[in-house]
Each structure stands twice: as C-alpha cells, then as structure tokens.
Amino acid sequence: MNLKSLANPSVYFSLTLAILAFGLDRAHKAFQVSAECIAIGAAPCVEVFTSYVPFAMTDWRGGEVVRVTDFFDYVLVWNTGISYGLFDSLPVWSLGVVTAVAILALAIWWVRADSALIRMGLALCIGGALSNALDRLLYGGVADFFHLHWGTWSFYIFNVADVAITAGVILLLADLIGLGRPQKAPV
C-alpha cells in the first residue's frame, strides 16, 4: 500500500467494516457471556459453563435452548475447535497460532488489494476472526449462539463474527467471478 492508495475511500470503508464486525461481536458477547467467566480470564470457561453460571444482565443461562421461531433457536455453545468444530482436540495454543497466521495472511492480502470488494471482504473476515481469536484467548473456546434448523436439518451454531466472516467470503467470491469490476468494452 502506498500513499496514493490511502486516498482511496475503500481503505477507510473497509477498516470501518473490520471495526464494526469486531465491535458488534464483542458487544453481543459482553452482554451475554457471564461476568464471572470474564473474571476467570484464561481459565477454561468451557468447563465453567457446564455448571450453573448466570449471565450478566439477563436471566438466561448458557446451555438451555431458547426457541425464537420454528427454525431459529438461541443457545450458548462453546466451540473449542475452529469452523464447524473442526480440530477441537488440538490444544488452544495451536489453534491460536493457526488463527494468528491466517489473520496475518489476510492482513497482508488486504494491504496489497487493489479492489474495494476484496478489501471489504477481507476486512469482514479479519474483524470476525480477531473477535473469535479473542474468545479463544480469554475463554479457551469461541462462544456461539445462533442455531438455524428446519425439520431434521440443522445448521451449525454460529455467532456475529461468523456472520461477518461468511459475508466477507461471499464478497471475495463475488470478486472472483467478476462482480464489482469494470467491464471491458468488446474489441
């Protein structure tokens, strides 16, 4: 990135997206994750939540399912792996290293990107990944809340950061297929 590219509005817009993705997820988790768990710090809050731990500012306790609609439930699940619970048997530090390397690679890609769509997609991915990484560092797992299902079909349980990451990937795929790029005139 050079000084000329700093004048590009997509740089500031994408930074705003990253901050929003991170901030909205942190705010949601601050409202829902117990103050007792936060006070524990690096202790494995995953184990704490298997017993009774009241949530800050609500009567809701993790683990119980709150049916919102016929296809949407609200529940706290601690994901000790990465997406879809993959690699949940690996130690937290190794997942932290993988996450840090991924975030660094995305940041380098963001700096070198010349497309607004790529910058926005990467920013959403980085903001969401940073928030989930902070969960892993603080609690030993990532707090997930939203569960979509229909009949016997069940989607994985996710959080606001996961929504940001998914939206970021969709923007990257849109750029890959050419959306948002100026069309070349036929010769």
PLM features: residue spans?
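Alpha-helical transmembrane bundles and membrane-interface segments of multipass inner-membrane proteins
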Residues: M1-V187
